[in-house]
Regions:
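Catalytic glutamate of the conserved HExxH
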Residues: 69, 73-77, 81
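Acidic/histidine-rich, surface-exposed loop or edge segments in extracytoplasmic proteins
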Residues: 1
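Zn2+-dependent metallopeptidase catalytic core
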Residues: 4-28
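Hydrophobic (often cysteine-bearing) scaffold residues that line and stabilize catalytic clefts
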Residues: 10, 67, 90
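Post-HExxH zinc-binding segment in Zn-dependent metallohydrolases
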Residues: 84-117
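Catalytic zinc-binding patch centered on the HExxH motif and its immediate surroundings
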Residues: 31-54, 64
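Membrane-anchoring alpha-helices and their flanking helix-loop junctions
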Residues: 32, 36-39, 80, 99, ...
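Short pre-active-site segment immediately N-terminal to the catalytic Zn-binding motif
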Residues: 51-70, 84-86
Length: 117
Protein backbone atom coordinates (compact mmCIF):
# COMPACT_ATOMS: atom_id res chain seq x y z
CA UNK A 1 0.00 0.00 0.00
CA UNK A 2 1.21 3.50 -0.84
CA UNK A 3 0.10 6.44 1.30
CA UNK A 4 1.18 10.02 0.77
CA UNK A 5 0.36 12.47 3.55
CA UNK A 6 -0.41 15.44 1.30
CA UNK A 7 -2.19 13.48 -1.45
CA UNK A 8 0.45 14.86 -3.80
CA UNK A 9 -0.42 13.67 -7.33
CA UNK A 10 3.24 13.72 -8.36
CA UNK A 11 4.11 11.35 -5.50
CA UNK A 12 1.38 8.97 -6.62
CA UNK A 13 2.53 9.15 -10.23
CA UNK A 14 6.21 8.60 -9.33
CA UNK A 15 5.20 5.59 -7.21
CA UNK A 16 3.29 4.03 -10.14
CA UNK A 17 6.26 4.69 -12.45
CA UNK A 18 8.73 3.16 -9.99
CA UNK A 19 6.43 0.17 -9.33
CA UNK A 20 6.61 -0.69 -13.02
CA UNK A 21 10.41 -0.70 -12.86
CA UNK A 22 10.61 -2.34 -9.42
CA UNK A 23 7.42 -4.41 -8.89
CA UNK A 24 8.66 -5.41 -5.43
CA UNK A 25 7.63 -1.93 -4.23
CA UNK A 26 4.07 -3.27 -4.29
CA UNK A 27 5.09 -5.88 -1.70
CA UNK A 28 5.54 -3.41 1.15
CA UNK A 29 3.71 -0.56 2.85
CA UNK A 30 5.15 2.85 1.99
CA UNK A 31 4.18 6.15 3.55
CA UNK A 32 5.47 9.48 2.21
CA UNK A 33 5.54 12.23 4.82
CA UNK A 34 6.11 15.80 3.68
CA UNK A 35 7.93 17.74 6.38
CA UNK A 36 10.46 20.51 6.95
CA UNK A 37 13.92 18.91 6.85
CA UNK A 38 15.84 22.20 6.71
CA UNK A 39 17.57 21.64 10.06
CA UNK A 40 18.58 18.12 9.00
CA UNK A 41 20.21 19.46 5.80
CA UNK A 42 18.72 16.68 3.64
CA UNK A 43 16.05 16.46 0.95
CA UNK A 44 14.74 13.15 2.23
CA UNK A 45 15.35 9.82 3.91
CA UNK A 46 13.79 6.44 4.41
CA UNK A 47 13.08 4.83 7.77
CA UNK A 48 11.75 1.38 8.55
CA UNK A 49 8.98 1.47 11.14
CA UNK A 50 7.82 -2.07 11.93
CA UNK A 51 6.90 -3.46 8.49
CA UNK A 52 6.36 -0.04 6.92
CA UNK A 53 8.83 2.08 4.97
CA UNK A 54 8.44 5.75 5.84
CA UNK A 55 9.87 8.28 3.42
CA UNK A 56 10.27 11.74 4.87
CA UNK A 57 10.73 14.30 2.11
CA UNK A 58 11.39 18.01 2.44
CA UNK A 59 8.22 20.02 1.91
CA UNK A 60 9.81 22.85 -0.11
CA UNK A 61 11.61 21.32 -3.09
CA UNK A 62 11.53 22.23 -6.75
CA UNK A 63 9.56 19.78 -8.85
CA UNK A 64 12.77 18.26 -10.28
CA UNK A 65 14.35 17.88 -6.82
CA UNK A 66 11.13 16.38 -5.44
CA UNK A 67 10.92 13.76 -8.20
CA UNK A 68 14.64 12.94 -7.97
CA UNK A 69 14.52 12.66 -4.17
CA UNK A 70 11.41 10.47 -4.15
CA UNK A 71 12.96 8.17 -6.76
CA UNK A 72 16.17 7.98 -4.68
CA UNK A 73 14.18 7.04 -1.58
CA UNK A 74 12.04 4.49 -3.43
CA UNK A 75 15.27 2.79 -4.56
CA UNK A 76 16.09 2.49 -0.84
CA UNK A 77 12.66 0.94 -0.22
CA UNK A 78 13.39 -1.62 -2.95
CA UNK A 79 16.72 -2.33 -1.24
CA UNK A 80 14.93 -2.77 2.09
CA UNK A 81 12.63 -5.36 0.50
CA UNK A 82 15.71 -7.24 -0.74
CA UNK A 83 17.59 -6.93 2.57
CA UNK A 84 20.44 -4.77 1.21
CA UNK A 85 22.06 -3.15 4.26
CA UNK A 86 25.52 -2.04 3.11
CA UNK A 87 25.37 1.78 3.05
CA UNK A 88 27.97 2.10 0.28
CA UNK A 89 26.00 -0.23 -1.99
CA UNK A 90 22.69 1.40 -1.04
CA UNK A 91 23.80 4.96 -1.77
CA UNK A 92 25.79 3.96 -4.85
CA UNK A 93 22.76 2.36 -6.48
CA UNK A 94 20.37 5.14 -5.44
CA UNK A 95 22.64 7.90 -6.74
CA UNK A 96 23.37 5.95 -9.92
CA UNK A 97 19.66 5.59 -10.75
CA UNK A 98 18.04 8.78 -9.44
CA UNK A 99 18.81 11.21 -12.27
CA UNK A 100 18.38 8.71 -15.10
CA UNK A 101 15.00 7.60 -13.78
CA UNK A 102 13.96 11.19 -13.03
CA UNK A 103 14.78 12.14 -16.63
CA UNK A 104 12.72 9.22 -17.95
CA UNK A 105 9.81 10.07 -15.64
CA UNK A 106 9.86 13.81 -16.37
CA UNK A 107 9.85 13.27 -20.14
CA UNK A 108 7.26 10.49 -20.06
CA UNK A 109 3.60 10.46 -20.95
CA UNK A 110 2.27 9.93 -17.42
CA UNK A 111 4.01 13.07 -16.20
CA UNK A 112 2.83 15.12 -19.20
CA UNK A 113 -0.76 13.94 -18.66
CA UNK A 114 -0.50 14.82 -14.97
CA UNK A 115 0.66 18.35 -15.84
CA UNK A 116 -2.30 18.82 -18.23
CA UNK A 117 -4.85 18.35 -15.43
Amino acid sequence: MFFNSDNNPIAESVYVFMSIIFPQLKETDIEVIHTDLTEDNVFGWTLINNDQNEIEIHNDLSERDYVTTLIHELVHVKQNVHGVTDDTIREGEAYELENTLADIYLTGNSYRMLKQR
